[in-house]
Amino acid sequence: MSRYTGSLWKVSRRLNYSVSETGKELRKRAYGPGQHGQKKLKLSDYGLQLQEKQKLRFTYGVSEKQFRKTFDNASKLKGIHGEMFLVLLESRLDNVVYRLGFAKTRAQARQLANHGHILVDGKKVDIASYRLKPGQTVTLREKSKNLNIVQEAVNSKFVRADYVSLDKELVGKYVRYPQRNEFLPDINEQLIVEYYNR
């Protein structure tokens, strides 16, 4: 299954959850899209698990195949499976680029990475799913700092996560792995674990 490229606003309304983390999608119409969008359906346990999985998958913008692979990799790590899964997703290069404020959305961050604008520890990395380790630096190539999407993002009001840092020269650092209470508070990862373990 390929990565979704349609309207994320429709997805957010269908899931009743802001996948962009801004909340803009639900301000005007806080109900599902389409003719029957305003009808409230009672979901089964499976439906709730699937919905939670889709919320997280669309938030990070990854394909089902990548999502499942990351979930399986998390099972090999020490710690609570669901939490380790979220930490692995947060450690993706495109997500850290977004958390640093180099891009306004994860989709923009993914594009910056895929097009070779990002340096990790001074070396070009063009794989958006590259997994960062604490202490690694993330910067933009010198000529990439003047890109419109970068300038707009850097100059916008942005609340940076505590587990990343950015200096005046736009040198970012993945300081440490995030604590569970520092990101995506509305996601119940246990439902996703139950979905894949059913």
Curated annotation (Swiss-Prot):
Domain S4 RNA-binding: 91-154
GO molecular function: rRNA binding; structural constituent of ribosome
InterPro entries (UniProt xref): Ribosomal_uS4, Ribosomal_uS4_bac-type, Ribosomal_uS4_N, S4_RNA-bd, S4_RNA-bd_sf
Gene Ontology CC: small ribosomal subunit
Keywords tagged on the record: Ribonucleoprotein, Ribosomal protein, RNA-binding, rRNA-binding
Any one Gene Ontology BP term: ribosomal small subunit biogenesis
Annotated signal peptide: none
Subunit structure: Part of the 30S ribosomal subunit. Contacts protein S5. The interaction surface between S4 and S5 is involved in control of translational fidelity.
Protein family: Belongs to the universal ribosomal protein uS4 family.
Function: One of the primary rRNA binding proteins, it binds directly to 16S rRNA where it nucleates assembly of the body of the 30S subunit.
Protein's UniProt name: Small ribosomal subunit protein uS4
Native organism: Onion yellows phytoplasma (strain OY-M)
Gene name of this polypeptide: rpsD
